[in-house]
UniProtKB/Swiss-Prot annotation:
Signal peptide: none annotated. This is Probable 3-hydroxyacyl-CoA dehydrogenase B0272.3. It is found in: Mitochondrion matrix. Homodimer.
């Protein structure tokens, strides 16, 4: 009879052997993130299916991917129209669109969720995915603010669940945070890292901590700039100039907040504050709340900390 240690080792080997090479990727959510992930996956010669309940969102995503590819092709083959067309077609031919989750995940080797940051909606989606997908399918989330342990709470097999946090715009941003929670298997994690490298990203590993690496450092930095301004210690303009010229940042914290979206910044910080109310760095900003309540969400709305034409 096998000892418990041997049994665990055999199970680990079995799990590793069962996981298949990633060829078929299903991305759920046809927004900017989902579209970008689809583009880089198809560009890496993977078979891609993009799923969204909204047909018009799928059509918009398809057109957006095509336009993005045309820009890439024009830059790569500036004087060769035929090569440009061939590049665009070769990538688009590997992307399918669908409104049916169950049908789209049944042959997937990897599922990437890129939908709204609502934990109840995500849990409902993952319940459907786990039932319809193969037992070896890797199931991941692109969440930027929610804990994997909370999202995957009801999954029966948590060993094949992990996080793939891409950055917007996906085709241009080189980083991919590969996130593992306490039950993510080594085999799953290693395959997610391999996938990241396949799609041309530099991967960094992180445990299931709020905001992972980038947002955990970046969002509190932006909020500390807000507190500096709210206390009257310096103007927004001077804070932005100081961080650009003194720290070498490409954008100051207020410019960056407007670029990210003030509603997005507020959503992330509100979620962290609810989970960790004693953490001073996660304290909400009255000014930010007021701007968001007024519909001033940054560049996308025409006004945030600054006004945009």
């Amino acid at each position: 009879m096998l000892s418990s240690t041997c049994t665990a080792a055999v199970r680990g080997l079995s799990t590793t052997a069962q996981l298949s090479k990633i060829n078929n990727v299903t991305i759920i959510g046809a927004g900017l993130m989902g579209s970008g992930i689809a583009q880089v996956s198809a560009n890496a010669k993977l078979n891609v299916t993009v799923v969204d309940s909204n047909q018009s969102a799928l059509e918009k995503a398809q057109q957006g991917i095509a336009n993005s590819l045309k820009r890439v092709a024009k830059k790569k083959h500036a004087d060769d129209a035929a090569a440009q067309t061939a590049l665009v077609s070769s990538v688009l031919d590997r992307i399918k669109m669908s409104t049916n989750v169950s049908d789209s995940v049944k042959d997937a080797d990897l599922v990437i969720e890129a939908i709204v940051e609502n934990i109840d909606i995500k849990r409902k989606l993952f319940a459907e995915v786990e039932v319809a997908a193969k037992p070896t399918t890797l199931i991941t989330t692109n969440t930027s603010s929610l804990r994997l342990a909370d999202i995957g709470l009801n999954l029966k097999d948590k060993s094949r669940f992990g996080g793939l946090h891409f950055f917007n715009p996906v085709p241009m941003m080189k980083l991919l945070e590969v996130v593992r929670h306490t039950e993510t298997s080594d085999a799953t994690f290693n395959q997610l890292v391999d996938y990241g490298k396949t799609v041309g990203k530099t991967t960094v590993a992180c445990k299931d901590t709020p905001g992972f690496i980038v947002n955990r450092l970046l969002v509190p930095y932006m909020f500390e700039a807000l507190r500096l301004y709210e206390r009257g210690d310096a103007s927004m303009e001077d804070i932005d100039v100081a961080m650009k010229l003194g720290a070498g940042y490409p954008m100051g914290p207020f410019e960056l907040s407007d670029y990210v979206g003030l509603d997005t910044c507020k959503f992330i910080m509100d979620g962290w504050h609810a989970q960790y109310p004693e953490e001073v760095a996660f304290t909400p900003s009255p000014l930010l709340n007021s701007l968001v309540d007024s519909g001033k969400n940054g560049r996308k709305s025409g006004e945030g900390f600054y006004k945009y034409k």
